[in-house]
Structures are given as structure tokens and as C-alpha cells.
Amino acid sequence: VKAINIKNAQRVGIVYRGDDEEAKELVERYVKFLKNYKVKCKTLGYYNADELPRYVTPKLEYDYFVKKDLNWKLKTLIPEVENFIQTPFDILIDTTVKEDEVLRFIVRKSQSTFKVGAAGLKDSSDLDFTINLKEGEGLRQLMKGLDNYLHLINKN
């Protein structure tokens, strides 16, 4: 495990629920923020549906997948997900704040060197660094906490 400061990261991966408007908005904002540090970002958004909504189109930093792209063992059937898993991101941000076996599967299989996310979930042991959320806190507080600590870790 190699903990890395966000300012020193070259590549950051983010997994999130694309069908969660708050998650989508926060991830898009954070990607813009990281680009100011010249950090390359790749996000993978999951839609619990058979098809992507018409208004969703993959872009340079944004890939998506849907329920039908997985088999019953949650093994991916599309190259975008496999490429994301195989990319050794300096930091992988898991945005799940509730149990989500699909996104946790991606995090578990990821080749990233430093995986961060929320504590207290069933598979939090797959993460190298976690943030404890208080009752009623959600993704906004997780992202704020992670950003704060990722700026403090291994500060030069």
C-alpha cells in the first residue's frame, strides 16, 4: 500500500452510482478540481438499469456501465470496466456510502495502489484508507473528508 497525496497523484480513478444525481454532480465537480492539479482522472459510473439514459454519453474521463453488462457473478462483459479495473490508479476513490455489491466488486478487483472510501460497510476491509461517517452523513461529507485527508497524507 502506497499512500499518496492528491497533489502528487498522476492518475485517480473514481467509482460511483451514475443513477444517483448527487453522486454524479459531486464526481463531476471533483474531476474538474483535480484537473487543476494536472491529475488525470477516469470515472466509472454504474446505472442499475438495462440501458443508459439517452442523455448520458461517455466522454474522455467518464465511462459507464449498466446491469446487463455484468453476468450473475458480477463479472464484467465490457472492455470499459475491465480497462478501469486493470488501470493501476495512484488513488481509487470509492464513493459508496451504502452497501453496493456491484461497485464494491469493481473496487475489490481494481489494480489501484491506494483505495479510499467510507468506513463501516461490509467490504470496507478492501480499502486502504477509510473515513468514518456520522449518522445521517452521506457522500458530500465523504468526499469532503477524503479530499481533506488526501491533501494531508505524505505532504511535501
State where each predicted segment sits.
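Structural beta-sheet core signal
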Residues: 14, 43-45, 117
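Conserved nucleotide-cofactor-binding alpha/beta core module
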Residues: 35-83
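Active-site and donor-binding regions of nucleotide-sugar-utilizing enzymes
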Residues: 69-133
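Histidine-anchored nucleotide/phosphate-binding helix
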Residues: 20-39
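Active-site-proximal region of nucleotide-activated glycan assembly enzymes
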Residues: 125-156
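Residues at the starts of beta-strands that form the adenosine-phosphate
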Residues: 11, 39-42, 114
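Short N-terminal or domain-adjacent regulatory/targeting segments
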Residues: 1-11, 21-24
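Structural motif
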Residues: 15-19, 46-47, 95-97
